[in-house]
């Protein structure tokens, strides 16, 4: 097993879980963050904010100094909130000029760029150039950070322009409990990974109202159809929906209280929009992406009533208590599929 030096940008749950997995695979892992408490915690063998008093089963190092974190790393992983990607790319760019022949970039950030409505790999390309885009791999799939950290069996997908590099990254992560499977759809993987979070808010809200698997299944069915419409308009491949990054990730995010987006949706009914947003302390990707989703739906003139309705809730235009009633009307108006 080769010992690679790996830099992970981020000290959150996902960054720490992936760092732990890579360290267990025999690599040297450095995490970079801006929170001194989290950095110190990681250096003492814990990340109590996300994993309580569970000690790491392998060694991780963390620092607030970006130059130290990157060092001579062979791999740089972006594991930060999507809202921070712009500024972090600008900082990282300074340290990449002499690494053109070797460094491989890995993106696990979820979202669609708010300004351009483009997938995040295109943002990375615009910031860092075509050379690094050709050495970029994006990972996504059904994977709660806590379960990856606890070494529960997990399967996700990886995609990128260079299939050889994609396979190399897959092997970097693969173990007897964690598997990354290559997929040839850069657009689809990222669109599904982003929009499923908004659907999870919708499902969580409806579940808070009805506590019904029947209702959840109906909203999921219609929501998945809408995601597929949007993805195809953005040039995703039709079959990607059946992959781990498609239906697998959608099911995970839309069916469990472990999902921040699902829980956020439940809180909308209990507390209302304003209070839920004010009290929320975690990254809720579905909330971050709803304006972008609205722009895409408008741009391509897509009929997406479930998405349009949950967007109205988040905009404060539709009472959360009216959302489920609106969904019921949509169910009753469904036409026979031909």
Swiss-Prot record:
Transmembrane segments: none annotated. It catalyses: sn-glycerol 3-phosphate + NAD(+) = dihydroxyacetone phosphate + NADH + H(+); sn-glycerol 3-phosphate + NADP(+) = dihydroxyacetone phosphate + NADPH + H(+). Its EC number is 1.1.1.94. Keywords: Cytoplasm, Lipid biosynthesis, Lipid metabolism, NAD, NADP, Nucleotide-binding, Oxidoreductase, Phospholipid biosynthesis, Phospholipid metabolism. Pathway: Membrane lipid metabolism; glycerophospholipid metabolism. Belongs to the NAD-dependent glycerol-3-phosphate dehydrogenase family. This is Glycerol-3-phosphate dehydrogenase [NAD(P)+]. It comes from Malacoplasma penetrans (strain HF-2). The lineage of its organism: Bacteria, Bacillati, Mycoplasmatota, Mycoplasmoidales, Mycoplasmoidaceae.
């Amino acid at each position: 097993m080769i010992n690679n030096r790996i830099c992970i940008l981020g000290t959150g749950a996902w960054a720490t879980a992936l760092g732990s997995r890579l360290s267990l695979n025999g690599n040297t892992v450095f995490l970079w963050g801006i929170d001194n408490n989290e950095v110190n915690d990681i250096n003492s063998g814990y990340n109590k904010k996300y994993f309580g008093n569970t000690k790491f089963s392998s060694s991780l190092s963390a620092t607030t100094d970006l130059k130290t974190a990157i060092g001579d790393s062979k791999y740089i992983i972006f594991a930060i909130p999507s809202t921070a990607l712009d500024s972090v790319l600008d900082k990282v760019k300074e340290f990449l000029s002499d690494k053109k022949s070797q460094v491989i970039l890995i993106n696990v950030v979820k979202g669609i760029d708010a300004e351009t409505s483009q997938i995040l790999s295109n943002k990375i390309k615009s910031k860092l150039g075509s050379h690094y885009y050709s050495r970029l791999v994006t990972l996504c799939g059904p994977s709660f950070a806590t379960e990856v950290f606890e070494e529960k069996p997990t399967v996700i997908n990886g995609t990128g322009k260079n299939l050889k590099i994609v396979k190399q990254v897959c092997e970097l992560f693969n173990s007897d409990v964690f598997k990354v499977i290559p997929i040839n759809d850069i657009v689809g993987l990222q669109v599904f990974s982003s929009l499923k979070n908004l659907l999870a808010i919708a499902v969580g809200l409806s579940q808070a109202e009805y506590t019904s698997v029947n209702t959840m299944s109906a909203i999921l069915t219609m929501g998945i159809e809408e995601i597929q419409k949007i993805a195809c308009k953005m040039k995703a491949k039709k079959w990607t929906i059946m992959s781990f990054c498609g239906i697998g990730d959608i099911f995970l995010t839309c069916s469990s209280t472990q999902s921040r987006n699902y829980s956020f949706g439940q809180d909308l009914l209990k507390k209302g929009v304003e209070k839920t947003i004010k009290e929320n302390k975690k990254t809720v990707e579905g909330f971050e992406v709803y304006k972008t989703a609205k722009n895409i739906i408008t741009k391509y003139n897509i009929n997406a009533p479930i998405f349009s309705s949950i967007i109205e809730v988040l905009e404060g235009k539709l009472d959360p208590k009216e959302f489920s009633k609106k969904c019921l009307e949509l169910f009753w108006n469904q036409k026979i599929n031909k």
